[in-house]
Curated annotation (Swiss-Prot):
Membrane topology summary: Multi-pass membrane protein
Bis-His motif, short sequence motif: residues: 9-10
Chain ranges on the Cytoplasmic side, renumbered to this chain: 87-129, 175-187
Protein name: High affinity copper uptake protein 1
Similarity comment text for this entry: Belongs to the copper transporter (Ctr) (TC 1.A.56) family. SLC31A subfamily.
Chief site of localization: membrane
Amino acid sequence: MRMNHMEMHHMGMNHTDDNITMPPHQHPTTSASHSHEMMMPMTFYFGFKNVDLLFSSLVINTPGEMAGAFVAVFLLAMFYEGLKIAREGLLRKSQVSIRYNSMPVPGPNGTILMETHKTVGQQMLSFPHLLQTVLHIIQVVISYFLMLIFMTYNGYLCIAVAAGAGTGYFLFSWKKAVVVDITEHCH
C-alpha cells in the first residue's frame, strides 16, 4: 500500500517556526511576588533569592534559609561519604565466611598431594546482600540529590556539597583498610 505523504497532514501536528515563550514558573504560594522564570542559570552565582532546592516547594529566599540549606547539604554530603565507607565495612564483614575445600592431586613419584581451594560465598537472598542492596539504593538516591544540588550552580550550595564530601572523606576514610594481595603482579 502506497501512502501519500502530503495527504497525511503530518498527523495534525503544527510544524511552524513560531516563537514560543514559556510561561513564568509559579510556585504554589499565596504571594504574588513569588514567581520567577523557568530558565536555570548556566554559570555559577552567589545568591539566596528564588533558589530552588530539589523540589518546587523548597525555595530559598533569605540568608537564614540559605545558611540552613548549606548546613543540610553539607551534612548530606558527609553522610554520603560515611555511607560509602560503611558499605565497604559491611561487605568485608559479610565475606568473612571462607570455606576451604581440599582435593587430592597426583604428585611426583606416585605420591598424593592435597590441593586446597578457598571459596568465598554469599547467597543472593542472604540478609547481608539484601542490606547491601537497600544501602546501595539509598546511596544512589543521595548521589543524584547531591548532583542536582550542584547543578543549581549556586556557589553556596556547590561549596556545601564539596566541603561536606571532603569532610566526610576526611572523617570516615582515614581508617579505610587497604588490602594488598602479595600474589598480585600489578600493584
